[in-house]
Design a protein with these regions (language model features):
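Zn2+-dependent metallopeptidase catalytic core
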Residues: 2-26
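Short active-site segment of divalent metal-dependent hydrolases/proteases
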Residues: 77, 81-85
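Short helix/loop segments within enzyme catalytic domains
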Residues: 114-122
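Hydrophobic or amphipathic, alpha-helical segments that drive membrane association/targeting
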Residues: 1-5, 30-43
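N-terminal low-structure segments adjacent to metalloprotease catalytic domains
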Residues: 1-4, 60, 85
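Active-site scaffold of zinc-dependent metalloenzymes
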Residues: 36-70
């Protein structure tokens, strides 16, 4: 999918998604995580579709992995959910509870919300 098409879809659906999730996060596009971060920081992250940064209050979409409207909408929903979650608690689940991604309550919540993606399909 072209970057232009990803921008078009994002511009169409994100205002409604962000309103519904009460998120004021901004969206930026990069081809992949390596394009945004140094290679050392991005090790083992080459499959990321998107991510939310609590430091910048930004959602980063990685265009190399966006091949459908569904991917884009799901990613925007998922990261909007993270934008409303506590960073300290998010990290504590990993660091103090030793949970992995699949068992992390915040990831479970974000993935649950992703299932509502068709609500934003046009």
């Amino acid at each position: 999918m072209t970057t232009g098409k990803i921008i078009e879809i994002t511009n169409k659906v994100y205002p409604l998604i962000s309103k519904n999730y009460k998120s004021n996060a901004k969206v930026e596009l990069y081809s992949n995580i390596f394009d945004r971060l140094s290679a050392n920081s991005a090790v083992n992250e080459d499959k990321a579709f998107a991510e939310y940064s609590w430091d910048t209050n930004k959602i980063y979409l990685y265009t190399n992995h966006m091949n459908s409207k569904e991917n884009i909408i799901r990613s925007l929903i998922h990261e909007c959910v993270h934008s409303k979650q506590s960073y300290d608690i998010y990290e504590a689940y990993y660091n103090e509870c030793n949970l992995d991604y699949e068992l992390h309550p915040y990831e479970i919540e974000a993935e649950y919300e992703e299932e509502k993606w068709e609500k934003y399909k046009y």
